[in-house]
Amino acid sequence: MLGWVVTFLIIALVAGLLGFGGIAGASIEIAKIVFFIAIVLFAVSAVVGLMRGRRPMV
C-alpha cells in the first residue's frame, strides 16, 4: 500500500510541476486533488503500519 502512495505522490508532484509551470494549466486542480489524496493515504498507511508494529516496506 505504501508503494501505491509513493507512486501517486510522485505523479501528483509531476502534474503539479507541469500545471504550475504553465505547460498544462488545466492540470492544476487535478494535481492538487491527487497530491492531497496521496498525503492522506500516506498518513493512513503510516498509522496502520505503526499500529501493526511492522516496519514499512519502502
Swiss-Prot record:
Q: Which residues form the signal peptide?
A: none
Primary location: membrane
Topology within the bilayer: Multi-pass membrane protein
- Which keywords describe this protein according to UniProt? Cell membrane, Membrane, Transmembrane, Transmembrane helix
Record-given protein name: UPF0391 membrane protein OCAR_5266/OCA5_c27040
**Native species:** Afipia carboxidovorans (strain ATCC 49405 / DSM 1227 / KCTC 32145 / OM5) (Oligotropha carboxidovorans)
Similarity comment: Belongs to the UPF0391 family.
The regions listed as transmembrane in this protein's record are 4-24, 30-50
